[in-house]
């Protein structure tokens, strides 16, 4: 968003790096840069919000130079699989269009022309990360979270319940994270 670009510019200015970094507002499925512009495309736990993950990866391939790498982590459906109702519950709460699987990401990367170097399932530790999120929400960021949601304690309780559900799904291997690195 324009707001995020402005924030990023402030941060790069503060670090004295504004001359080395150029930013453009764009769409990950239509990246506003020419072919072979980058040596790295990177993402962190955000591609779960993208509807057309195939197009995202194809665009990454397009803007990468030969030998360039794509590296990302993302929230995924775990190897134990989610039922339709479990997937719907997590996707609705998190506002995901859907979650890919690790094997699904491998296929998307290969179909786009990438050679996979790393495909790690990080699900085993994911439940502990969610536990930490819950602890932070209930012990450290309670005031800030309540402020964001208009001090609605009922909604705050519902949010906590959804996070506990996600933790349960992660402990069962149904919901997790992956790390992927591939080369063009």
Specify the residue positions occupied by each region the protein language model found.
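Class I SAM-dependent methyltransferase SAM/SAH-binding core
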Residues: 1-30
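A short acidic, Gly/Pro-enriched loop at the edge of an enzyme's catalytic core
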Residues: 29-41
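A short glycine-rich, Lys/Arg-flanked "PGG" loop and its adjoining helix->strand segment in the class I
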Residues: 54-69
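Core SAM-dependent methyltransferase catalytic element
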Residues: 112, 134-139, 174-184
């Amino acid at each position: 968003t324009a707001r995020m670009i402005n924030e990023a510019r402030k941060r790069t200015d503060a670090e004295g790096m504004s001359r080395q970094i150029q930013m453009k507002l764009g769409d990950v499925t239509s990246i506003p840069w020419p072919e072979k512009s980058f040596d790295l495309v990177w993402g962190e736990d955000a591609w779960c919000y993208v509807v057309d993950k195939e197009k995202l990866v194809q665009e990454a391939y397009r803007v990468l130079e030969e030998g360039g790498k794509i590296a990302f982590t993302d929230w995924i459906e775990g190897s134990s699989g989610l039922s339709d109702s479990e997937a719907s519950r997590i996707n609705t709460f998190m506002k995901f269009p859907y979650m890919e699987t690790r094997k699904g990401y491998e296929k998307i990367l290969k179909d786009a022309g990438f050679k996979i170097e790393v495909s790690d399932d990080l699900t085993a530790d994911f439940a502990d990360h969610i536990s930490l999120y819950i602890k932070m929400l209930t012990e450290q960021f309670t005031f800030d979270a309540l402020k964001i949601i208009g001090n609605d304690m009922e909604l705050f309780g519902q949010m906590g319940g959804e996070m506990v559900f996600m933790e349960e799904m992660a402990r069962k291997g149904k919901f997790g994270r992956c790390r992927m690195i591939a080369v063009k």
